[in-house]
């Protein structure tokens, strides 16, 4: 078929190609209809009709035949023809409204909740949920999920607490084997130090370190790292204090594993004449107090409102329940001036540290007449470790605490401390320490919970000289996000916290800084399969 339009736009001729149809001529008066308008109309229809056909086919496939009215068809076709968006935004607004309505409704008792998304979809289909019922079930599922997650987190913290308080099998084996060696091997019982070095133990020309611990492996790392990192190892004297049950094993280790040219002395608490009940009555009271025993050895969850406690707060409370905090070994640092009456200046080290830098310059630090050289713990990049002020350790709702302490005062750290014993002996630090321990016992431990640092923060008030933070980096036992570059630069790194490097819960990427000083070639270490 051919379409012919005359140049004057006054006639249109349609003829068939096979000439079976006669020529058709259409003549239209120009005054009634514009031929140009007619041409444009036909042209537009030629473009639109294919799209209308395609759209109709699509709508048919989507089920337009199910519509029972022209209005239904209009709702389906109208937005497509007019370019309007679908109803998803309106549906979302309606669903938000329903969610707000059910957020304050009480969830019915005995409501059976799906265990998975697929089960939820199946229940919706089988039970013909309306939107409100679906929203209520969804809310109940989310609340149950949050409770389960919270309970799992607290269970994890409890398990971590018990793991941190336990003695690893390898370390227990090491202690037993070395104790047996002490009884059967005369060399393991040799005098420490040798008789010719006994005068050095009270010679203030040497650099005296004090370490109080019942962990033989940890003690070996502290001593080895300090000696290997020192520019003057021949000036180092270590005074190691341990309890009676560990004394034989500790003595055996250092008798059989020399750290020459450094000198090591091992003493048990039972060998100090000064440590009598008359001199430390408050510690006996602490150990025998029923409230203390229940607090440290009782049910760690009883009385704790877990719904109002954050995991971080719960973790801190668990750490404060470590049995080591009522151990005499942990309180011994407050008696250093009496235990070492001939020494003028010492550095006290915890057993969970590693010495990476030369500590010789510490003996040249001027404490300005103060007793205790320590790093602050309220300034630094680490918000978890370096954000400690007195409010983090004390209960300021207690009138005595509120009266004597400032909650915003910066705290300082134990772990690596320089003690001027001459200045210390002129103070009443020990008496103040005992006095506040008694007050806390009277208050049934309501003034503070966390170990030996709180009474020390009070007792040393006004006697602390702040040293540069590069000397002592804390927190390697708290979190895995510790900055590795800062770890490498620190003179002393401190694994304070539950994740000790000798435990399986220790952080793998931080452990090598500690294991570097473990002598894995030692027969006792190998036979006890330490950290294997």
UniProtKB/Swiss-Prot annotation:
GO terms for molecular function: polygalacturonate 4-alpha-galacturonosyltransferase activity. It is a single-pass type II membrane protein. The keyword ATP-binding does not apply. Signal peptide: none annotated. It is an enzyme of class 2 (transferase). Coiled coil: none annotated. GO terms for biological process: cell wall pectin biosynthetic process; mucilage pectin biosynthetic process; pollen development; pollen tube growth. Residues 1-40 are cytoplasmic. Keywords: Cell wall biogenesis/degradation, Glycoprotein, Glycosyltransferase, Golgi apparatus, Membrane, Signal-anchor, Transferase, Transmembrane, Transmembrane helix. Its EC number is 2.4.1.-. The chain crosses the membrane at residues 41-61. Pathway: Glycan metabolism; pectin biosynthesis. Pfam families: Glyco_transf_8 (PF01501). Disruption phenotype: No obvious phenotype. Increased galacturonic acid and Gal content in cell wall, but reduced xylose and rhamnose content. The gaut13 gaut14 double mutant is defective in male gametophyte function; swollen pollen tubes disturbed in elongation, and characterized by a disorganized outer layer cell wall with an altered repartition of pectin (e.g. homogalacturonan). Belongs to the glycosyltransferase 8 family. May be involved in pectin and/or xylans biosynthesis in cell walls. Together with GAUT13, required for pollen tube growth, possibly through the regulation of pectin biosynthesis and repartition in the pollen tube wall. This is Probable galacturonosyltransferase 14.
